Amino acid sequence: MYPDLKGKVVAITGAASGLGKAMAIRFGKEQAKVVINYYSNKQDPNEVKEEVIKAGGEAVVVQGDVTKEEDVKNIVQTAIKEFGTLDIMINNAGLENPVPSHEMPLKDWDKVIGTNLTGAFLGSREAIKYFVENDIKGNVINMSSVHEVIPWPLFVHYAASKGGIKLMTETLALEYAPKGIRVNNIGPGAINTPINAEKFADPKQKADVESMIPMGYIGEPEEIAAVAAWLASKEASYVTGITLFADGGMTQYPSFQAGRG
């Protein structure tokens, strides 16, 4: 636990499930005040809100599409209206779907790039604007992926979005470091989230994925949430412009593990 996170205001996009939900609950345990953004009426953000409160934090929910400027502005304004400020912005909302690149409709490309990359830009922009205008040494955390460095056939839109997030984060970190604003990425590997549930329910597919992870197991959302809490805390006060991979070693060329090559 990080005592300096107590009372901090954190907004998390895509927080109704998966990594976003785990991060919301972790910040609840840190006794932070959490703005839970969700996209679809099919999701139940109030369940997450209750878990955050039960964990020791405060929480509000706000619906919004991160590809829309006004919705993203409203997420930041909700934090300010409900809790008086914003300290930490976590741009977590993301999409993926497999399509052969030569068959990919432009609408699929636009949807993934819009959510993953443009959404992260809008969240970063609105948070940083507030930080600058109010002289706040705030914190932006973007959710990238191992696929900012590992090519991923059938997911060219996803890989491109994460590669874009990498350079966007590094650029923002360099631009706003003089103002004490930190901007970092988290790069998860294979994580046991709802988006992966069907794949990991198949023993063969699960084993195939595990074979690419030197540590030998698929990560849990709480392990990513722990990384987010550290990056947001004073313990990481000298850290900006990085991608912190939490991937069980997936980015470390696992095929060389047995001394091959």
From Swiss-Prot:
NADP(+) binds at residues 11-35. SUPFAM superfamilies: NAD(P)-binding Rossmann-fold domains. It catalyses: D-glucose + NAD(+) = D-glucono-1,5-lactone + NADH + H(+); D-glucose + NADP(+) = D-glucono-1,5-lactone + NADPH + H(+). InterPro entries: NAD(P)-bd_dom_sf, Sc_DH/Rdtase_CS, SDR, SDR_fam. It comes from the Bacteria. Induction: Induced at stage III of sporulation. GO terms for biological process: lipid metabolic process; monocarboxylic acid metabolic process; sporulation resulting in formation of a cellular spore. Keywords: NADP, Oxidoreductase, Sporulation. One of its GO terms (molecular function) is oxidoreductase activity, acting on the CH-OH group of donors, NAD or NADP as acceptor. Homotetramer. This is Glucose 1-dehydrogenase. It comes from Bacillus subtilis (strain 168).
